[in-house]
Amino acid sequence: MTTDPAVDGGSFIEAAAVGALGAMFASAVGAPLGFAVPFGVVGAANGAITGWRQVYDWSCTNGFVAFALDSTWSIPMTAAGVVSQALGIVRGRPDYDATLSRRANRQVFRRGFVPRPGFVITVGNVVSGAGDTSVPRRRRLITDHEDVHVWQARWFGPLYPLLYGSWMVGGGAAGMVLWATRRRSEPFAKVVESCAYYLNPFEWWAYSRHGHWPP
C-alpha cells in the first residue's frame, strides 16, 4: 500500500499487526513485574500508532531493533512518548510531519508538547517542537541531533531519565559553585545552564553528532 509521505496516515493492516506484536512483546516483559496489562496497553498503542503512520523501517535491521526496544526494554520511555503525543493533541494542532517520520523510526511534530518555548523536546520515540521543517537547518536538527536522543532513550531505556536527570542536578550544583568561586562576572543562569545542560554527556553526544559542539 502506498501513501503520500506528507499525509499523516497509512496502513490499517500494519497498524493492526504492529499493535498486536507490540502488545505481545510488552506484556511479556511486564508479566514478571506484575505489569503485563499496562505494559501491553502501551505496546499496543505505540504499535498501532506507529503502524498506521508506517514509522518503523522494516527494510533494515534498525527498524526491527527500534521496534523491539520500544516494545520491551524501553517501554517506560515509549509510554512517556505516548503521553507526550496526547498532551500535544490537548494543546491543539500538533502538526505531525510524516516526511521526517515515515520509515525513520521516530515520530516528529512541528508543534506538539513543548514545555519550553523555542526548544525541541524528544520523549521516547516522539520529537515535538520541530518548527518549520521546510528549512534545511531545522530538518538537520531533527535528523542529526534529536534522532540521537531517540536512540539514547531506546538503548538506555528506564535508566535514561535517571542518568540525564542526575547529571542535570549534579551539573547544576557544580555550576552554582563554579559561578560563586570563579565566574561571578558571567550571568548566573548561563553558567548553571552550561554545566547542567550543555556539558551533559547525552547532549554532548547529540551536539557532536549534529556538528555543533561546542554549541
How should each PLM-predicted stretch be described?
Residues 1-62:
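Extended, hydrophobic alpha-helical membrane-active domains that insert into or remodel lipid bilayers
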Residues 10-23, 48, 61, 65-89, ...:
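Metalloprotease/metallohydrolase-associated module, dominated by Zn2+-dependent proteases
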Residues 58, 113, 133-137:
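Generic hydrophobic alpha-helical membrane-segment signal
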Residues 118-120, 127-144, 197:
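Short pre-active-site segment immediately N-terminal to the catalytic Zn-binding motif
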Residues 147-165:
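Catalytic Zn2+-binding segment of zinc metalloproteases
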